[in-house]
Swiss-Prot record:
<dbReference type="InterPro" id="IPR013221">
    <property type="entry name" value="Mur_ligase_cen"/>
</dbReference>
<keyword id="KW-0067">ATP-binding</keyword>
<comment type="similarity">
    <text>Belongs to the MurCDEF family.</text>
</comment>
<comment type="function">
    <text>Cell wall formation. Catalyzes the addition of glutamate to the nucleotide precursor UDP-N-acetylmuramoyl-L-alanine (UMA).</text>
</comment>
<dbReference type="Pfam" id="PF08245">
    <property type="entry name" value="Mur_ligase_M"/>
</dbReference>
<dbReference type="GO" id="GO:0009252">
    <property type="term" value="P:peptidoglycan biosynthetic process"/>
</dbReference>
<comment type="pathway">
    <text>Cell wall biogenesis; peptidoglycan biosynthesis.</text>
</comment>
<keyword id="KW-0133">Cell shape</keyword>
<keyword id="KW-0961">Cell wall biogenesis/degradation</keyword>
<feature type="binding site">
    <location>
        <begin position="119"/>
        <end position="125"/>
    </location>
    <ligand>
        <name>ATP</name>
    </ligand>
</feature>
<keyword id="KW-0547">Nucleotide-binding</keyword>
<dbReference type="GO" id="GO:0008360">
    <property type="term" value="P:regulation of cell shape"/>
</dbReference>
<keyword id="KW-0132">Cell division</keyword>
<keyword id="KW-0963">Cytoplasm</keyword>
<dbReference type="GO" id="GO:0005524">
    <property type="term" value="F:ATP binding"/>
</dbReference>
<dbReference type="InterPro" id="IPR005762">
    <property type="entry name" value="MurD"/>
</dbReference>
<dbReference type="InterPro" id="IPR004101">
    <property type="entry name" value="Mur_ligase_C"/>
</dbReference>
Length: 450
């Protein structure tokens, strides 16, 4: 860990606990800050807050009182999930108090360089692929962020010869000041999180913060097939490395003659890759680009791509029952992810979809329903998905209250050779704590059918 003195004896407000807030508060105390921790959940229900209080921190729970800002606060470290429209953040901004997220702290203390990966979809798969390729190539990666350990915990122990690989959301990237990844990858942009950002433009600009501090000594890995990403790459001063599944890229990554190439050199045949789905070729090209930029051999990349079958809750194969294959794609929290999941199969599909209503309709899914023989909807968006399915002319359309019911109905509508696919196209928070919980409940319900 770098020797950092900028936080010593400063009053720093950690807003929102959870894993990242807990780690940030603990780190800041270690760095000599006077830490004030604030969380909306009452202290009596807040185990993490009680632990921080026992460490000697000033803990205020049950709301976000504006009076906290009267304590000569030098910095606010916010939980990514707390919107900037929250009154305490609005007031902090008016007082010109810097507001950052935990990943910014991680960067400031880390001896190791960062690889940052963002995009609307594919972040986790690309992050895991990158980690595995670098590990196989003996480049000493450590993984941090939404998968793995919280970034500022990893950064404390990361050495100069290692590399921190982290998945970054728009929420996290809105709170960066000095964060400068050696390699920044921007995979794609799709209209999402409008309840948080307001517009797709603002959402895209938040994502583009990944390029904010890059220089000509850094690299920006860009999806050449995504017009929005290409436009936002103008914010990068780094060396641009493009990847594409549709056109030949001489100085980047592409698919040519059914093989993956990087800077004109063949790396692997597409037929040797075990990870399913056309969309995953984009993720693979991005990960391969990062790995090659860090000196990983073609042999190491090939070894990984011949064994990597995917990440849990991302088009995860569950089991086969009476020749029906069940797949868990609970991480599909927006339409683009579900479109890509539906495009991954040629067999008839029984689709389970639904979840949190963020105000959008689902007509964009209609062209992807060509292999969908039946849909079972659940959650807040069930009526909207039913409308889209009716417009698509699906014969079998059902709505149920719970995911358990949806699994039973989906199985009843399936036949020999079908795929039963959970790909909700929505966030999970209307009925579940996380998409992981939703996926686990789906898997449990499937196994009950056996």
């Amino acid at each position: 860990m770098k020797t950092v003195t900028e936080f010593q004896n400063k009053n720093i407000l950690v807003l929102g606990i959870a894993k990242s807030g807990y780690a940030a508060a603990t780190l800041l105390q270690k760095l000599g800050a006077n830490v004030i921790v604030n969380d909306g959940k009452p202290l009596a229900e807040n185990v993490l807050a009680a632990e921080l209080q026992a460490k000697g921190m000033d803990v205020v729970c049950g709301g976000h009182p504006l009076e906290l800002l009267e304590r000569n606060i030098s910095l606010v470290v916010k939980n990514p999930g707390i919107p900037y429209s929250n009154p305490i953040l609005v007031a902090a901004k008016e007082k010109q108090i810097p507001i950052v997220t935990e990943v910014e702290l991680a960067y400031r203390i880390s001896e190791a360089p960062f690889v940052g990966i963002t995009g609307s979809n594919g972040k986790t798969t690309t992050t895991m692929l990158t980690f595995e390729m670098l590990k196989e190539g003996q480049k000493h990666p450590v993984i941090a962020g939404n998968i793995g350990t919280v970034a500022c915990e990893v950064a404390q122990d990361a050495k100069e010869n290692e590399v921190v690989v982290t998945e970054l959301s728009s929420f996290q990237l809105m709170g960066v000041e000095l964060f400068q990844p050696k390699i920044a990858a921007f995979l794609n942009l799709f209209e999402a999180h409008l309840d948080y950002h307001g517009t797709k433009k603002e959402y895209g600009l938040a994502k583009a913060n990944i390029f904010k501090n890059q220089t000509e000594n850094d690299y920006s890995v860009i999806n050449a097939d995504d017009a929005d990403v290409m436009a936002l790459s103008a914010y990068s001063k780094g060396q641009k490395i493009l990847f594409s599944t549709t056109k030949e890229i001489e100085d980047g990554a592409c698919i040519k003659d059914n093989a993956l190439y990087f800077k004109g050199e063949k790396v692997i045949e597409v037929s040797d890759i075990v990870l399913p789905g056309q969309h995953n070729l984009e993720n693979i090209l991005a990960a391969m680009s990062i790995a090659k930029l860090l000196g990983t051999s073609n042999e190491a990349i090939t070894v990984v791509l011949k064994r990597f079958t995917g990440v849990k809750h991302r088009l995860e194969y569950v089991t086969t029952i009476n020749n029906r294959k069940f797949y868990n794609d609970s991480k599909a929290t927006n339409m683009l992810a579900t479109e890509k999941a539906l495009s991954a199969f040629t067999q008839p599909i029984v689709l389970l979809a639904g979840g949190l209503d963020r105000g959008n309709e689902f007509d964009d899914l209609i062209p992807y329903f060509k292999n969908v023989k039946a849909i079972v909807t659940f959650g807040q968006t069930a009526p909207k998905l039913v409308r889209a399915a009716e417009k698509a002319g699906l014969d079998i359309i059902e709505s149920v209250d719970t995911l358990d019911e949806a699994v039973v109905k989906a199985y009843a509508h399936s036949k020999d050779g079908d795929v039963v696919l959970l790909s909700p196209a929505c966030a999970s928070w209307d009925q579940f704590k996380t998409f992981e919980e939703r996926g686990d409940i789906f898997i449990q319900a499937v196994h009950k059918l056996i």
